[in-house]
Amino acid sequence: MRHSPSWSALRARLQHPLIQAPMAGVQDSTLAVAVSRAGALGSLPAAMLDAAALERELHTLQRELGLQGLPYNVNFFCHRPPEVDAQREAAWRQALAPYRTQWGLGSEAAPAPVRQPFQAALADVLAQHPPPVVSFHFGLPSAPLLDRVKGWGSLVMSSATTVEEALWLQAHGADVVIAQGLEAGGHRGHFLRADHDLEGQLPVSALLAQLQAAVSLPIVAAGGLGHASAVSAALQSGAAAVQVGTAFLLCEEARTPAVHRQALMRAAPVCEAVPAEAATAL
């Protein structure tokens, strides 16, 4: 297992080498607080929060965790938002209109929440309440923004789905690499290839082994680790910790909708999941 001074300091504050994956839309600070109080690392997804909402959540985390010396993670995206094509938007709305009428959903779909990349306005808020850990998805922010985050003492983590991405993260200032295997239910974190080809994506066990041979940073295993045996195997294979998301969806502190809770409770213990190009999160 690899260690860095910043990771070793964080690990010493955790009872369990377990990170709750940030899951935008199905959780807020309530779940993060519960996880950190239980001895693992709770995470707050911030990609869908504006500056005011982020400040409220950071106040909660500082009050409920920071003042007690408990660590927590705040997660941001580093993607480039797509440009909206008004004609294509109108075309797909028109194509789906008959189905919305058939199922009594109304004529217009509600606009989806916008996931914003990490930017200066959010960094200004974060600087007032520096979290122990800041994690990123889809790479890292610009060098000036990353320097600000590291300057106030936060440990920086980011996801890699390939060796190439892990090497890039190591070269550009990450303290910890999250090895996101193909089994992961969240957004695919790939960021170096424009085509987002899934053929080169590996299961977490294979990816963990490749990253251990290629980079010197601590590596967190992520993807399909929903059982104690899988967690144990990842740790025995050298992972510094594991990151788990789906397994937390049935917690009472999660905001998982009732229909999704029912589906999870009805699901078979083992089922096949097939990644798709059109959507990268379950």
Pin down the residues of each PLM region.
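Active-site entrance/lid segments in N-terminal catalytic domains of soluble metabolic enzymes
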Residues: 1-214
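Conserved active-site-proximal phosphate/metal-binding subdomains
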Residues: 97-99, 187-220, 225-282
